[in-house]
From Swiss-Prot:
This is tRNA-2-methylthio-N(6)-dimethylallyladenosine synthase. [4Fe-4S] cluster 1 binds at C50, C86, C120. Residues 419-486 form the TRAM domain. It is found in: Cytoplasm. Keywords: 4Fe-4S, Cytoplasm, Iron, Iron-sulfur, Metal-binding, S-adenosyl-L-methionine, Transferase, tRNA processing. Its main location: cytoplasm. PROSITE patterns: MTTASE_N, MTTASE_RADICAL, RADICAL_SAM, TRAM. SMART domains: Elp3. GO terms for molecular function: 4 iron, 4 sulfur cluster binding; metal ion binding; N6-isopentenyladenosine methylthiotransferase activity.
Amino acid sequence: MCRAVAGVTRFVFTLALGVGSAHVTHAMKKKTSVSEQPEQRTYEVRTFGCQMNVHDSERLSGLLEDSGYQPAANGEEPDVLVFNTCAVRENADNRLYGTLAMVKPMKDRNPGMQIAVGGCMAQKDKDAVVDRAPWVDVVFGTHNIGSLPTLLERSAHNQRAEVEILDSLEEFPSVLPAKRESAYSGWVSVSVGCNNTCTFCIVPSLRGKEQDRRPGEILAEVQALVDQGVQEVTLLGQNVNAYGVNFADEDLPRDRGAFAKLLRACGEIEGLERLRFTSPHPAEFTDDVIDAMAETPNVCPQLHMPLQSGSDRILKEMRRSYRSKKFLGILDKVRERIPHAAITTDIIVGFPGETEEDFQATLDVVEKARFSCAFTFQYSPRPGTPAATMPDQIPKAVVQERYERLIALQERIQAEDNKELVGTTQELLVQETGGRKDAQRHRMSGRARDGRLVHFTPSEDVRPGDIVEVTITDARPFFLIADGPLVNHRLTKAGDMSGAGQTPTTAPIGVSLGVPTIGIKPQADATAAPKNVHEGCGCD
């Protein structure tokens, strides 16, 4: 790919991972021809699911803007509406098709409008999406998000639906441009896919086997973000601490210590103030990663470590490859090296065959672990997973009752631990959004270095992306409050960009580093896509 920006020509090498066979079907339908469509078309991306989907949506937005589309103004109907979907839980099906039914009147009002469905649900359902929602124009999967502009053009030209699902990854998403959501915080993928075989999880069948990016490409993308003022980067992967086992570049040797080395290398990037990662797998979490976290100043004192169940018997049925003793041992090691680390987790309630004794084991581990936050899920059978056909599926009423007990326990723990932070000083990266009542109470919100959400009373010149220090005055289970005067306020480049309505647009990054550009958001009454609906995945 070759692209010129500001007089600089960028040559980007695309990593070829092999193109799987494409499953393509066509459904004839009436459309407005290309010649009748306006020259400058608008788009909106709606995201359902995990952080990987949020980052993929940044790529989709970058692709569309690179192809001449503009973000639709807030409240206006777009010419192209893209759904980036999730398939992890059962209600994902109902949510997608219910939403598609709701937007059909929009399509009826504007026959030239195009609707595209991508992501995990599209990868799973393929042409069934068009069967169930014939007004959909394009269906694309997790392996070929770069095909979206071409599929939209082809569908409009041929006046028929285009469904293209690849069986394996076409190219790393990093070779695509990205319209970043935030001026101060960014996602960077270290890998795609997953080699684990958890019996409840559909993700490996939809995302494929793990493929790891070259370290230099990851560092180049982080540097490109930091050069544009981004202060916080989160490294993304289905199992980040398996990084280095399956490099897509066959010339790179297998390296089980690669993730710890990557953390340390990110620590050398000047201007990167906060580094996070998600999600590791307890079975492969090693001491060298803990050491790298403790010894690299910009790595935040936060760890997301999925538990899923505290019962060793259920963990075995889940095919999780660790037991509760090992899990708690990891937490002990982390807290020994990083005493104030905030540890979060995922837990599934009601896995097939879970007895009251099994559930009590989960409660016991939660009590001992004292998570700062737990993303809890009621087990949802997914067709095609081993757990979906296991005997002894738990009645919904039983699952609900256990779920409520777990929530009550975790809220108590969070309330107790958060109260201990009252009176402490916390450094916050100010967010654009945070609390539902921020405007009503004249507050802003930010994240502490350990990831806790803090609502605070700002001075007049505080902007999203700035760094402030506050004194905690009160605590709730899910957030902290700082209602006193600011201890300190540091203006930042990210704050300047936020104030100007700007976010980075990073160029494709292959072997060489692309030169990032600056994307201008619409004014205050026009919010750029994508619009995200975040749902924790619970599949790590």
